[in-house]
């Protein structure tokens, strides 16, 4: 197959390949960028593989960075862009089931492509636009298949994270997992426990917020991968609802909120669950806010003060979450009520703590408590948001 109409991300990099070729070496675009080109997907950047050794690349280009030179990768700075260029290589000895103990540079593109994870990622393209396909990646693209290169078990022993990448690609591309590859995941799912939680989390999130997440999540459950991640062991029955949902979460926060709801975790367990997954404090707070507000609107109509405390972002996330779970909720009414609030944050209130101190409220915890009482009164329409009304309120409540 020859591609003649290349997008700018490729044409901008062509001079880099040509310069390597002119120096007497092979160079190709490889991996996900070639796959996404063939699928007409957005391409963020390109990866380049070459027969040239790292020191030879450094001689060809003036500006380089030793990104991972021991493993054959040099970053070339060219025309304001950076390109990762990696020498053809083979790998061996994966004692940690993640990184190779030994890397050997080779001169053969086919040997380099053999170490790739899936056939659709083992494609290469030269400066002439010809696609090189040694493992029927083009056929698997046509069939919408995720298939391991060579023997799947070997690929997963080399890097156990590839099992999560398989279900992630399923979800993102809305492809099917090839049966032998799926069987190899089922047989080796325990290896996932060797991988850092952060890396698993990143793949899980990408899987969970992609359009094909329901089918991918079913494989995630069926193969036993779910048993190897934080907080999911023995919870298959709880999580089995996910593949039956009509919609996927579109944000990371809603994905975690959905997991917490499906797992039936009480609010006090949310922090420990989020920390097990190595989430940030900001994400933990955001998810806790969504779950708390979701529980509230599931049990009663929220007050104006509830809407104020939640904020528009949490309200919108809760509406999306209810939609995903098929729960009836008048989302537009909630948003309209929020937009009509007399104040939406502390700065909207015409007074602050200094005003209270000037009006005879003694310094201490009472100042903060009284501010909240005033906000509630303003939000519920008991008083107007002006100094005169608030002063009168103070005279009656202080």
UniProtKB/Swiss-Prot annotation:
DNA damage keyword on record: no
Enzyme Commission code(s) on record: 2.7.7.72
Cofactor(s) this protein cannot do without: Mg(2+)
UniProt: CTP binding residues: 32, 35, 116, 159, 162, 165, 168
GO-annotated molecular function: ATP binding; CCA tRNA nucleotidyltransferase activity; magnesium ion binding; tRNA binding
Enzyme's top EC category: transferase
Binding residues for Mg(2+): 45, 47
Binding sites annotated in the UniProt record for ATP: 32, 35, 116, 159, 162, 165, 168
Summary of the function given for this chain in its UniProt record: Catalyzes the addition and repair of the essential 3'-terminal CCA sequence in tRNAs without using a nucleic acid template. Adds these three nucleotides in the order of C, C, and A to the tRNA nucleotide-73, using CTP and ATP as substrates and producing inorganic pyrophosphate. tRNA 3'-terminal CCA addition is required both for tRNA processing and repair. Also involved in tRNA surveillance by mediating tandem CCA addition to generate a CCACCA at the 3' terminus of unstable tRNAs. While stable tRNAs receive only 3'-terminal CCA, unstable tRNAs are marked with CCACCA and rapidly degraded.
Additional observations: A single active site specifically recognizes both ATP and CTP and is responsible for their addition.
Subunit structure: Homodimer.
Protein name as catalogued: CCA-adding enzyme
Taxonomic source organism: Lactobacillus gasseri (strain ATCC 33323 / DSM 20243 / BCRC 14619 / CIP 102991 / JCM 1131 / KCTC 3163 / NCIMB 11718 / NCTC 13722 / AM63)
């Amino acid at each position: 197959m020859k591609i003649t109409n290349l997008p700018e991300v490729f044409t901008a990099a062509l001079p880099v390949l040509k310069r390597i070729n002119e120096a007497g070496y092979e160079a190709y675009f490889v991996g996900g960028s070639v796959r996404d080109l063939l699928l007409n997907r957005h391409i963020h950047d390109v990866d380049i593989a070459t027969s040239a050794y790292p020191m030879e690349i450094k001689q060809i280009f003036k500006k380089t960075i030793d990104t991972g030179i021991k493993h054959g990768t040099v970053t070339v700075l060219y025309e304001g862009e950076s390109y990762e260029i990696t020498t053809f290589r083979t790998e061996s000895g994966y004692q940690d089931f993640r990184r190779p103990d030994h890397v050997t540079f080779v001169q053969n593109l086919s040997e380099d492509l053999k170490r790739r994870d899936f056939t659709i990622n083992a494609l290469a393209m030269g400066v002439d636009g010809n696609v090189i396909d040694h493992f029927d990646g083009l056929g698997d693209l046509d069939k919408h298949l995720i298939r391991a290169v060579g023997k799947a078990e070997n690929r997963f022993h080399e890097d156990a994270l590839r099992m999560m990448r398989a279900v992630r690609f399923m979800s993102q591309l809305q492809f099917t997992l090839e049966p032998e590859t799926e069987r190899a995941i089922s047989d080796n799912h325990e290896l996932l426990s060797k991988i850092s939680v952060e890396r698993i989390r990143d793949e899980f999130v990408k899987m969970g917020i992609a359009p094909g997440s329901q089918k991918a999540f079913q494989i995630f459950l069926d193969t036993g991968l779910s048993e190897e991640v934080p907080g999911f062991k023995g919870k298959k029955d709880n999580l089995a609802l996910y593949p039956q949902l009509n919609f996927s979460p579109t944000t990371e926060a809603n994905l975690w909120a959905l997991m917490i709801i499906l797992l039936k975790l009480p609010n006090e367990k949310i922090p420990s669950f989020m920390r097990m997954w190595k989430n940030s404090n900001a994400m933990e707070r955001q998810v806790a806010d969504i779950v708390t507000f979701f529980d509230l609107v599931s049990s009663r109509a929220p007050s104006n003060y509830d809407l104020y405390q939640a904020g528009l972002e949490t309200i919108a996330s809760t509406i999306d979450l209810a939609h995903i779970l098929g729960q009836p909720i008048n989302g537009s009414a909630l948003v309209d009520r929020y937009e009509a609030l007399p104040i939406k944050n502390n700065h909207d209130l015409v007074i602050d703590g200094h005003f209270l101190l000037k009006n005879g409220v003694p310094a201490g915890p009472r100042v903060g408590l009284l501010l909240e009482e005033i906000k509630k009164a303003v939000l519920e329409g008991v008083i107007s948001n002006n100094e005169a009304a608030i002063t009168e309120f103070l005279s009656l409540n202080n």
